[in-house]
């Protein structure tokens, strides 16, 4: 009898809790791109969201990397269709037409300062080149989906492409091209992660390119609430100095190295910048 009574209680209890309205859990904010070289971008977004707390209980606060390995173009498509919430990429007119940028440069122009990953035995050859020789004698490697590809070509450089970022390192070793331009904040870190796979590669010591290239957070055009929240948070982090502190923490090595180096900096035009784009403020790390 007791067993039957207990069973009735279990059934009734299950029915009672099933009948209760489900409590909606805040959805996560999915971001792209993902990987070690992008860590700073997402720490900055985390900082911005902390400076602009959610106004409602169901507003997303938790950041989650997009799980699938997709190309940059695919990532932008997913943002436009609701599969991804935030991306962090450089700007151009096409992107600004399709997505909603938060127009605060999150990398302060440092991505536009490009040094070259090269085969180590080419150090002396490239060091002896002037600007004209760089254009005439070198072939550069870039991802076919990166926004800096048309910048390089518009400035007279010969470029070999691949849709795979990782394949570009192997192509450089195989002499498919001569130099892989990488952001000042990217080159050393990327080679450090691949020193066992590609010990024959090095960062070139004497040359650099610079073009204005702001990097923004982007959201779906309809997601104005998230855009406003990110902008509010970034503005607050700029005001209290925490934005700059985070930037300098992540880029301290590169900033110190640049201060000591005597590189020939070749300034390039950026024809893909939308009209009215504010030039990056580089004084945190350069001049």
Task: Report residues per predicted region.
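Short amphipathic alpha-helical coupling segments at ligand-binding clamshell hinges
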Residues: 40-44, 222-233, 242, 246
């Amino acid at each position: 009898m007791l067993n039957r009574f207990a069973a009735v209680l279990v059934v009734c209890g299950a029915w009672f809790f099933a009948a209760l309205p489900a409590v909606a859990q805040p959805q996560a904010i999915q971001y792209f791109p993902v990987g070690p070289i992008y860590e700073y971008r997402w720490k900055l977004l985390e900082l911005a969201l902390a400076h602009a707390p959610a106004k409602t209980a169901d507003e997303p606060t938790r950041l989650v990397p997009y799980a699938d390995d997709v190309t940059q173009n695919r990532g932008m498509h997913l943002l436009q269709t609701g599969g991804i919430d935030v991306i962090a990429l450089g700007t151009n007119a096409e992107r600004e037409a399709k997505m909603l940028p938060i127009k605060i440069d999150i990398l302060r122009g440092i991505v536009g300062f490009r040094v070259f990953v090269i085969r180590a035995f080419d150090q002396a050859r490239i060091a002896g080149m002037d600007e004209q020789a760089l254009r005439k004698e070198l072939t550069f490697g870039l991802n076919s989906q990166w926004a800096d590809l048309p910048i390089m070509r518009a400035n007279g450089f010969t470029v070999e492409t691949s849709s795979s970022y990782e394949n570009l390192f192997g192509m450089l070793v195989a002499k498919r091209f001569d130099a892989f331009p990488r952001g000042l904040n990217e080159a050393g870190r990327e080679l450090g992660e691949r020193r066992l796979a590609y010990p024959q590669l090095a960062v070139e010591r004497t040359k650099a390119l610079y073009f204005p290239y702001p990097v923004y957070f982007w959201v779906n055009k309809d997601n104005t609430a998230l855009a406003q929240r990110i902008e509010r948070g970034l503005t607050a982090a700029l005001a209290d100095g925490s934005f700059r502190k985070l930037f300098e923490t992540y880029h301290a090595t590169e900033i110190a190295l640049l201060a000591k180096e005597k590189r020939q900096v070749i300034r390039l035009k950026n024809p893909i910048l939308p009209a009215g784009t504010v030039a990056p403020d580089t004084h945190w790390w350069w001049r």
